[in-house]
From Swiss-Prot:
The modification N6-acetyllysine is found at K92, K166. It is found in: Cytoplasm; Nucleus; Secreted; Lysosome. Pfam families: Crystallin, HSP20. The gene is CRYAB. This is Alpha-crystallin B chain. It comes from Bos taurus. PROSITE patterns: SHSP (PS01031). One of its GO terms (biological process) is response to heat.
Length: 175
């Protein structure tokens, strides 16, 4: 019986490490997909390519959670932390960085025992005062961290244009 051996460069000539089987790219609040647990199958076809993980839309993309926004009048971060109680969360400002940390110890759920921990850091834009940043936790588990953006210094004004009779650029004398 012959066994076909497919070299990874032949199967994926342009992206040999494009979509490895891995568990470390999860979002902390998301569940595993069944395809995350199995290696890419070469038994189906030598030309089978596992769909890359960035093409699969995670569930938070539909809800708009875990995002950072910079709007005209404010800066905000929305983060899905439904698996954590307010006592298990910390929000700190360190210089120009917001640090969000969540941790809960091992506890039992319907599937067994679970513990979770995450750290997220967000750079504060230059026009946001770090002392004015606030945070709140909604009833559905969305942590919102926001701060007002500084307004421009003074009202807008129009500057009149005057016309001059002399040219701005003069020709250099030829040697």
């Amino acid at each position: 019986m012959d066994i076909a051996i497919h070299h990874p460069w032949i199967r994926r000539p342009f992206f040999p490490f494009h979509s490895p089987s891995r568990l470390f790219d999860q979002f902390f609040g998301e569940h595993l997909l069944e395809s995350d647990l199995f290696p890419a199958s070469t038994s189906l076809s030598p030309f089978y390519l596992r769909p890359p993980s960035f093409l699969r839309a995670p569930s938070w993309i539909d809800t708009g959670l875990s995002e950072m926004r910079l709007e005209k009048d404010r800066f905000s971060v929305n983060l899905d932390v439904k698996h954590f109680s307010p006592e298990e969360l910390k929000v700190k400002v360190l210089g120009d960085v917001i640090e969000v940390h969540g941790k809960h110890e091992e506890r039992q759920d319907e599937h067994g025992f679970i513990s979770r921990e995450f750290h997220r850091k967000y750079r504060i834009p230059a026009d946001v005062d770090p002392l004015a940043i606030t945070s709140s936790l909604s009833s559905d588990g969305v942590l919102t961290v926001n701060g007002p953006r500084k307004q421009a210094s003074g009202p807008e004004r129009t500057i009149p244009i005057t016309r001059e009779e002399k040219p701005a650029v003069t020709a250099a004398p030829k040697k």
